[in-house]
């Protein structure tokens, strides 16, 4: 039993946690479609590491009733060919809407087909030409059940939220006089986090102030229900689909400069070796002094006079931030945290929504600095909630699967590297190989293979540790505007501080967080795939007029049928 995935409308796979996948040939799908929950009979066991084979016995739950595909017109009727379905979908003349041959369409099914008849449906939306990128991205969203607009109930609820926070400010620690700053990408509008560092004779004081979304988004509201459903914001190549309406994500909650903002602050004191000496947690009000970008902070670090003169009041603090981040990074490395150095491309669109540039996204000291501060903040909050036995949602990354480690080791040995004692895996073993190969020709491939062999991080109501970070306690606290997990953590941290949780409530929260963890882990996977697929659509459009040209490429993977390359 499980959810089936259909590949190219030709065959399917059933993935069952802890077991080998089951391959299902097209004729054995028995009307199952992508995303359906099905009961499968295994007809052939795995041989030589191949998948098992099976057939669908029963459709338990239909994953969706709306299917995306390309419309094909015949004389008196039409068909929609979908990658999510083995059989074409019959469309009568009356139910074709205004679709033309070759259009990308959304079809609502009213008959799923049987052994004698094809599935039947009605076209509910004509998205456009099947090669138009805006139509293809729209199709991605519909196919994943993503709605851009918020319901009228949510919109009305948000409209009633007051922008006046003066009464609340009196209840908070006032940090408005401090030179607190935000550091984000140039195009970021949902500014979650602000930072402040002060060097003293004992070491460093770090304040990380995070937008207090929980002040605005209350449990039991329509807004909260919608946030749970969305789970996270989605950053497509051409747009952002926010978890929260823009009045909150880009305005009330966003830590825009020179505005009073409600925040949740984690105050941490470190010695000069990066050891946490003491901490404090409190609700606060801040007024960010500068909306800094990674680019400008990197230029300050590189000692460029023009930028140093522009941001003179915070230059000393930025340099102290750099000192502290390097100390924290070294401490992370000593305990074995894995740090992948894999190149990432950023697609830049012009006003016509076509690719204007493709740039290699580099991780400079500013990016690392914020990453270091956010990681240590997440760890600090996680450890507090764990030892106080406060229910919450953790970000967990489990130990690698032994079978995958054995396969990885076979490849590493061919490159004259190896993992020792696979029964006792430690992240430091992987980091040692990464360090050795970082500047070698085979380094890129080895780092990718190690990454693919890792488990996928997920959310859980149980603290299972974070293997990649070598952390005993970890969660997500620092981005509540765009991740629902962080909003949960804020609420539970508030209960911890205010001693506002009774023992009999803990079981209720644990059960609720178990369900929510599963849901938001799934919405995160959907968002990641949508973000990657939308980028691929634009890249394919960009390469259309380059057919026949010769490029230097790097082989990034292969199987018995294909070789994958990166330009």
Which sequence ranges carry the predicted segments?
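Short, surface-exposed charged micro-motifs
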Residues: 3, 68-70, 194-196, 267, ...
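Short, glycine- and charge-enriched coil/turn segments that flank and shape catalytic ligand pockets
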Residues: 18-20, 45-50, 94-100, 160-172, ...
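Charge-lined substrate channels and their catalytic hotspots, especially those that engage the 3′ end
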Residues: 1-210, 214-260, 291, 299, ...
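Short coil/turn segments at secondary-structure boundaries
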Residues: 138, 152-156, 173-176, 278-282, ...
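Conserved, well-folded catalytic cores of nucleic-acid-processing
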Residues: 31, 41, 59-63, 108, ...
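Feature marking long nucleic-acid-engaging regions of large polymerase/nuclease enzymes
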Residues: 25, 107, 184, 191-417, ...
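Hydrophobic core residues within well-ordered beta-strands of beta-rich domains
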Residues: 38, 262, 549-551
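Structured C-terminal cores of nucleic-acid metabolism proteins
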Residues: 1, 380, 403, 412-567
């Amino acid at each position: 039993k499980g959810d089936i995935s259909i590949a190219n409308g030709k065959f399917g796979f059933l993935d069952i946690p802890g077991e080998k996948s089951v391959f299902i040939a097209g004729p054995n799908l028995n009307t199952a479609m992508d995303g359906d929950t099905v009961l499968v009979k295994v007809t052939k066991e795995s041989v030589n590491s191949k998948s098992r084979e099976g057939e669908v016995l029963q459709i338990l739950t239909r994953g969706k009733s709306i299917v995306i595909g390309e419309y094909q017109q015949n004389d008196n009727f039409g068909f929609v060919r979908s990658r999510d379905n083995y059989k074409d979908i019959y469309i009568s003349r009356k139910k074709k809407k205004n679709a033309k041959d070759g259009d990308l369409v959304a079809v609502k099914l009213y008959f799923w087909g049987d052994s004698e008849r094809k599935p039947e449906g009605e076209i509910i939306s004509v998205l456009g030409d099947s090669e138009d990128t805006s139509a293809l991205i729209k199709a991605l969203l519909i196919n994943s059940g993503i709605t851009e607009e918020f319901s009228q109930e949510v919109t009305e609820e948000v409209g009633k939220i007051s922008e006046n926070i003066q009464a609340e400010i009196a209840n908070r620690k006032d940090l408005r006089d401090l030179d607190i700053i935000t550091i984000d990408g140039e195009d970021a509008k949902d500014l979650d986090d602000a930072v402040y560092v002060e060097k003293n004779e004992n070491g460093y004081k770090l304040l990380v102030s995070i937008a207090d979304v929980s002040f605005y988004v209350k449990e039991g509201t329509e807004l909260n229900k919608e946030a749970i459903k969305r789970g996270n914001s989605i950053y497509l190549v051409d747009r952002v689909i926010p978890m929260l309406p823009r009045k909150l994500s880009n305005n009330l909650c966003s830590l825009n400069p020179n505005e009073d903002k409600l925040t949740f602050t984690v105050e941490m004191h470190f010695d000069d070796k990066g050891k946490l000496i003491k901490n404090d947690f409190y609700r606060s009000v801040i007024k960010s002094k500068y909306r800094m970008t990674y680019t400008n902070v990197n230029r300050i670090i590189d000692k460029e006079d023009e930028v140093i003169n522009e941001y003179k009041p915070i230059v000393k603090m930025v340099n102290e931030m750099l000192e502290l981040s390097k100390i924290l990074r070294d401490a992370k490395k000593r305990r074995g945290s894995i740090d992948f150095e894999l190149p990432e491309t950023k697609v830049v669109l012009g006003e016509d929504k076509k690719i204007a540039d493709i740039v290699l996204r580099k991780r400079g000291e500013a990016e690392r600095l914020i990453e270091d501060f956010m990681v240590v903040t997440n760890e600090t909050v996680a450890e507090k909630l764990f030892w106080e036995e406060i229910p919450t949602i953790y970000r967990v990354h489990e130990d690698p699967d032994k079978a995958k480690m054995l396969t990885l080791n076979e490849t590493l040995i061919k490159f004259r590297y190896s993992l020792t004692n696979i029964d006792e895996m430690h992240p430091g073993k992987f980091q040692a190989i990464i360090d050795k190969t970082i500047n070698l020709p085979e380094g890129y491939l080895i780092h990718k293979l190690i990454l693919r062999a890792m488990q996928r991080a997920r959310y859980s109501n149980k603290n299972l540790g974070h293997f990649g970070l070598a952390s005993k306690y970890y969660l997500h606290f620092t981005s509540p505007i765009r991740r629902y997990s962080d909003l949960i953590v804020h609420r539970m941290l508030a209960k911890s501080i205010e001693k506002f949780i009774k023992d009999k409530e803990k079981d209720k929260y644990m059960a609720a967080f178990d369900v929510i963890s599963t849901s938001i882990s799934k919405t995160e996977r959907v968002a990641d795939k949508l973000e990657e697929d939308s980028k691929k659509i634009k890249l394919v459009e960009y390469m259309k007029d380059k057919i026949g040209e010769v490029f230097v490429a790097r082989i990034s993977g292969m199987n018995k049928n294909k070789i994958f390359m990166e330009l």
